[in-house]
Amino acid sequence: MSSGIIFFGTPEFAVPSLKALISRGEKILLVVTQPDKPKGRGKNLQAPEIKKVALQCGLPLCQPEKMKDDNFIKKLKSLNPEFAIVVAYGKILPKEILEIPKHGCINLHASLLPKYRGAAPIQWALINGEKITGVTTMIIDEGLDTGPILLQKEISINDEDNAETLSEKLSVVGAELIIETIDKMRKGIITPKPQTGEITYAPQLKKDDGKINWNNSARKIFNLVRGTYPWPCAYSFLKDERVKIIKTEVLEGNAAPGLIIKAKNELIVGTQEGLLRILLIQPEGKKIMTAKEFISGRKINEGMDSFS
């Protein structure tokens, strides 16, 4: 008889789901996470957040380099799991693995599928100015986030959210949805439903996706700033100095796109439509600072100098 869960996950987003399964007494047969990766200037190996939790809780752990490794697949089969739960694992599972668990491989995806299929649904929902997003549990098939839907939960996005804070919220709501999903599957009261409605995509962000185009509206730039924090961060150039724009707010008014119209105690910049007040900014190689701190160390000419 199949029993127990294999958990696939890697970053901080997956931690609440694993902890929720542990705290309610689920039998975790194995935790699968990505190999340790070099990080930072020293390129020191850093363990994924899920590995840290697994080690703290004394859970069996595996970090395969390849998904199609015969020994790894044999190990999974020998565990005879009831479920595999997949939360931001970061690799595509091959068909041989998808067929192992009794109830299939259940994925938690951070959007209301079929909207925002792909690797960066939280970021793109913010960049596109969505007011509502959510989480979906689904049965993984061989496509990219194309499998049948089990459950969904909506949450609203507010103007204070960025990709970091929204990820935290969705990870908690998602953990609750994972528990609800496995409970209902055990009772046989969920019918997987094919995805219907408009399909949109959320590809992995690249560094260049953060480049600010001041010919966009203030609201559009504001959304870009929120959606790209903490990585890759929205950025622009001032007198050939590259700066990251960390937090902003939209104001009414008009000025030429990119033109700095206030630079005494605050930093206000023109856009194609509306004005943008920069609240937090990060010069290259420096810490995040307030606009006032940034201004105090520079000579900026109001009405003459521009971001580009």
UniProtKB/Swiss-Prot annotation:
One of its GO terms (molecular function) is methionyl-tRNA formyltransferase activity. This is Methionyl-tRNA formyltransferase. Attaches a formyl group to the free amino group of methionyl-tRNA(fMet). The formyl group appears to play a dual role in the initiator identity of N-formylmethionyl-tRNA by promoting its recognition by IF2 and preventing the misappropriation of this tRNA by the elongation apparatus. The lineage of its organism: Bacteria, Pseudomonadati, Nitrospirota, Thermodesulfovibrionia, Thermodesulfovibrionales. It comes from Thermodesulfovibrio yellowstonii (strain ATCC 51303 / DSM 11347 / YP87). Belongs to the Fmt family. It comes from the Bacteria. NCBIfam families: fmt. Its EC number is 2.1.2.9. Keywords: Protein biosynthesis, Transferase. It holds the Pfam family Formyl_trans_N. The gene is fmt. GO terms for biological process: conversion of methionyl-tRNA to N-formyl-methionyl-tRNA. SUPFAM superfamilies: FMT C-terminal domain-like (SSF50486), Formyltransferase (SSF53328).
